């Protein structure tokens, strides 16, 4: 019942084939990768794994320390201090909060250590490099998918991301660029919206439960900013017998999300080549360790929230819809296999059988 909308790439690409060589760094060098949390499995299972693997390939003598702050900004700051104390010469940070993480970049700069912002921008004049997809376009694609699979007068729910994550605001801005004209014209109805602190699915579940109660289950579409929120919304609708009848967007294309897509319960997810993002960050890390120029790895320069110019590598983004979208992700994401997706209920779907 859902149209197979969107198969195109949404953003400029990075030529990761060019990110494969670097002069050997010193054996005593160490790079620290600071993860934000473990609620979303991608950070440890995909991003960190790909970053470590790339570092082992291009700079096998460099030590990589991986930290996880479990969504606590003070913990992330302490972990950064610990990494610096242990001799880290480059910090690769996925900030919990784009503002408070500036302390990390500023402290590192005082010790002559550069900071790379991975996925989420760090609003500091000392942010050296940023790698990310076009999240505005990603949010717009999420909203467009839901619009294309609803009709005039239908009521929508928006489950937004974490208010402290700068990406969440950009994703939402992309969604609003599509939705606001329709809301203003009365062609769609904004039934309920809420932020999701820490991208916590439990909070998203409570929000969706509240939405269904307030709207008496009168919901025809869910614009969800990531797969965790999508899964929470689907679980809430499952209890009301609505799962599979309402288009639900997402982001990250986790294994669970792809299984839900094959079952027709989640209908879209935005996918980014996380292995390419990790490869870009690893290659820049080695360039920084060696004191080498890295301008050839960055295709753009952007300004962060404090007006500082930051070298930027935009990566591709893909709007995956239905079984075709699942097939594309499996084909292009080395961290996900068909066997991983074709488990449980999904194993009985036409895609897997």
Residue map of PLM features:
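Hydrophobic alpha-helical
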Residues: 81, 93-110, 175, 193-260
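Hinge/cleft segment of the Venus flytrap/periplasmic-binding protein
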Residues: 29, 163-167, 179-180, 280, ...
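Short beta-strand elements in bilobed, periplasmic/extracellular small-molecule ligand-binding domains
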Residues: 57-69, 158, 180-201
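N-terminal signal peptide c-region/cleavage motif recognized by signal peptidases
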Residues: 22-23
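Flexible loop/hinge segments that line or gate small-molecule binding clefts
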Residues: 63, 98-137, 148, 155-161, ...
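Extracytoplasmic "Venus flytrap"
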Residues: 30-59, 64-78, 94-98, 160-170, ...
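Hydrophobic alpha-helical segments within soluble ligand-binding/sensing domains
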Residues: 31, 76, 131-156, 170, ...
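Short, solvent-exposed amphipathic alpha-helices that sit
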Residues: 42-57, 138-142, 166-187, 203-207, ...
